[in-house]
């Protein structure tokens, strides 16, 4: 494979990304040096605005996996990825209206604190361990992806770039904490959009204009977006993306520490919701850019596919190879694209490191040593950032054998994120579920999702369900083409063509629904949780979202929890809690016999702010 090298200006543009990102970390380390508390370091003092937080949310999950993987998916399988437009909308609506209010009003720092309040410590610790494993695995994939791009376009050592990425991320995350991560993410989000726009403009010019791109994509069957086939074995259809994609991304947004940590860092609940909706706009923009980049790439390579012709060795190298071709005479712009890919990775890795440090400190260190000084807590938090930076970087080695970056990353989120989504749904939506049901449901969901994912890895789905759309090599100058027919499958068990062959986007749904069903059944068998033992602000039955439901049905959904519409409004306006030193609002118990009024609810905005946390949490 021919390697195309960077020019001097490419290195200048690329290096600028690293210097500016590191500089932001240094800036916040100096600016916040007098506020040496773990609270300031981990949640930015809970005084962030929705703008930078919204950009940070988008950048954190629109990583190099999106920059490199999504255009490649569209190039090979068509523009059905646009259906994620609908899935993202459902995800943000459910996150902002169902999950966020519970987490924000609690004053917690780690999402998994909620599980101890609702169930008990074993459930909390089990979920925390699963989250740590999931995040390290996922981060390994997104570190490896841009390193692959850099290796493809410059010949720079693959593992050298992996370690360079990890070092820079760990550096500014350890120095500046959450504020540095959020503001660096905002900068990197801008770089991602600019990088995509340059590819769209130059690529469409090379292809003869945008109209020509659409015409050639239509002729190549790349614009067949809405496939309503209900077969769950099909890789991408309208239903696999809307249903499976919603479950997958809801696990990422609704109950993920990286997301919730940013939301609770906002100054009010209203700002937190605005951040999510602002982030939705960013998700749509990046999705459209990535999909049209894939269509432009198909238009460019329609007569000579570099993948099947052997010019490149993996589908994830398509995008960087395409960029080097269209910017061959424009020094600096290939560097901008690689900076675009690395921007996504730096933001994701830094967010993951910060979140891992937070849950480890809050769920393990603080539980064992509750009376640590602020200074020591901050140093421990920074040490944890350093430790997880090393672990995430090392995990990238394993990502090299995981196949396509998009499927690998979403499979990881599905295997772990689905059961976690089910666990939090049991706690928030089903008041009668007890801790035995929660723990049993979590183990069931994990078992089911790993069973199907590992089975799919050993026995890949039949080619008829996953084979790409036709690709041509008719006009390749150097044709060393190998036959690309469907692979010959060895002896397979019957389950391999059914259970193991479901779309990877359904892994999360399998884990989530398995967790919920098992949790409900176990709770009914072992004895339902008494409603009187549950604090109202710990749950949010779905009936709350439907104002047209009668009071009778709403009362039924609350399963005996001491609650009615009047009580709910009173709880919102009073933010009732009892004082117990440095415990959070929900940890304060909300017992009726010891209620005091805690500031933090603005009746005019109908939104919480962080005054409550200033008063009672620290």
From Swiss-Prot:
Name of the featured protein: Sodium-coupled monocarboxylate transporter 2
Does this entry carry the keyword Cell membrane?
A: yes
Glycan-carrying positions: 480
Alphabetical GO biological process terms: monoatomic ion transport; monocarboxylic acid transport; sodium ion transport
Origin superkingdom: Eukaryota
Q: Give a GO cellular-component term.
A: extracellular exosome
So where does this one cross the membrane? 10-30, 48-68, 83-103, 129-149, 158-178, 181-201, 236-256, 276-296, 322-342, 386-406, 412-432, 438-458, 505-525
Keyword Ribosomal protein applies: no
Xref: InterPro entries = Na/Glc_symporter_sf, Na/solute_symporter, SMCT2_SLC5sbd, Sodium:Solute_Symporter_SSF
The record lists the organism as Homo sapiens (Human)
Upper classification of the source organism reads: Eukaryota, Metazoa, Chordata, Craniata, Vertebrata
